[in-house]
């Protein structure tokens, strides 16, 4: 594995263990060139998935991009990083087991919205503001009002 610090080609695995949910192997590595330590994760990939964007472009599904989007929505919120990891894993599994090799970006966004709704209402509204492309404050007010009403009803 190439070192992210010095780009040396070889590193030595110092420790391996499964993640809490068992969906990945966490490996601590040490670069044989500069001695820096870093962590890698090994996950099963059932098949390569393609995300179809709204403008028709196609991108290879990128789990780190999914996790980053969820993390940005949850920034400065009392959400445990392990819960973000579990949500990303659940969405990835749902996509991989769907039976399709291509999935619309809107479907992925909907899955994230559903997951964030159960995780944290503020993160849910933050993600929705980007996903649904809110243009003005009234869009926020209307959406937040609907979320608040749903919370009282449910």
Swiss-Prot record:
Residues 7-22 have a biased composition (Basic and acidic residues). GO terms for molecular function: ATP binding; DNA binding; zinc ion binding. It holds the Pfam family ATP-cone. Its cofactor is Zn(2+). It comes from the Bacteria. Residues 49-139 form the ATP-cone domain. GO terms for biological process: negative regulation of DNA-templated transcription. A zinc finger (unnamed) spans 3-34. Residues 1-22 are annotated as: Disordered. Coiled coil: none annotated. Binds 1 zinc ion. Keywords: ATP-binding, DNA-binding, Metal-binding, Nucleotide-binding, Repressor, Transcription, Transcription regulation, Zinc, Zinc-finger. HAMAP family: NrdR (MF_00440). Negatively regulates transcription of bacterial ribonucleotide reductase nrd genes and operons by binding to NrdR-boxes. PANTHER family: TRANSCRIPTIONAL REPRESSOR NRDR. Belongs to the NrdR family. This is Transcriptional repressor NrdR.
């Amino acid at each position: 594995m190439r070192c992210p610090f010095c780009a040396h080609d070889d590193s030595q695995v110092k420790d391996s263990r499964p993640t809490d949910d068992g969906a990945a192997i966490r490996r601590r590595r040490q670069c044989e060139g500069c001695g820096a330590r870093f962590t890698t994760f090994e996950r099963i990939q059932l098949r390569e998935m393609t995300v179809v964007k709204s403008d028709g472009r196609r991108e290879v599904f990128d789990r780190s991009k999914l996790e980053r989007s969820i993390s940005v929505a949850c920034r400065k919120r009392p959400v445990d990083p392990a819960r973000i990891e579990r949500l990303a894993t659940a969405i990835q599994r749902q996509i991989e087991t769907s039976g399709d090799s291509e999935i619309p970006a809107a479907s992925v966004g909907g899955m994230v919205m559903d997951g964030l709704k159960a995780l944290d209402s503020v993160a849910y509204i933050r993600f929705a503001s980007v996903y649904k492309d809110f243009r003005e404050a009234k869009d926020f007010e209307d959406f937040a009002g609907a979320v608040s009403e749903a919370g009282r009803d449910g």
